[in-house]
């Protein structure tokens, strides 16, 4: 695979992150399911997307700045079925909300996002298994943060459809 700028920034964060207080119970390599069954998710046009994203795909499509006929049910997707917009893959990947031992109170921020299609695209209404792993931890003077890599596996084909790296 090609190395991206985000890969380089993440690798710089692989050293000792120093004295952590809020995310001190998180470690690189941690499976964020922590023994629970894998998450299986879909993104339908009218279903809500969990506690972090209280809107539907249709609501997003109604306000999207760059509409595409491949995103809609009666569109002309070359796959014969609508696809999930790239900007919504982080929503799908984190539909079940955070599942890491983070001390509260804390505020969640998204710093970086990278989506890699492997055997994509990701289809509306299709089921995907999510596998999450912590791949980096770091801090600045005021912020503690971690990187989560989520693999989306298409349950219909068994193929790795996409990877979402969220910092």
Describe every region a protein language model picked out.
Residues 1-32, 119-167:
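HotDog/MaoC-like acyl-thioester-processing domains
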Residues 2-82, 167:
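Non-catalytic linker/capping segments at the edges of enzyme domains
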Residues 22, 34, 44, 50, ...:
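Generic structural signal for short, flexible, solvent-exposed coil/loop and linker residues
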Residues 45, 96, 113, 131-133:
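Generic alpha-helix detector with strongest preference for long hydrophobic helices that associate
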Residues 62-110, 114-118:
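Active-site helix/loop of acyl-thioester processing domains in fatty-acid/polyketide metabolism
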């Amino acid at each position: 695979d090609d190395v991206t700028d985000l890969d380089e920034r993440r690798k710089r964060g692989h050293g000792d992150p120093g004295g952590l207080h809020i995310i001190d119970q998180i470690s690189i390599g941690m499976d964020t399911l922590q023994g629970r069954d894998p998450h299986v998710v879909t993104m339908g046009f009218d279903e809500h997307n969990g506690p972090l994203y209280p809107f539907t795909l249709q609501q997003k499509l109604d306000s999207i700045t760059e509409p595409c006929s491949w995103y809609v049910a009666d569109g002309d997707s070359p796959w014969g079925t609508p696809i999930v917009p790239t900007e919504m893959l982080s929503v799908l990947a984190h539909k079940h909300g955070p599942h890491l031992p983070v001390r509260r109170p804390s505020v969640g921020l998204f710093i970086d996002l990278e989506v890699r299609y492997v055997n994509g695209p990701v289809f509306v209404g299709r089921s995907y298994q999510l596998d999450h792993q912590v791949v980096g931890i770091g801090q600045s003077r005021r912020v503690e943060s971690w990187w989560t890599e989520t693999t989306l596996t298409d349950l219909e084909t068994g193929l790795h459809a996409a990877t979402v790296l969220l910092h």
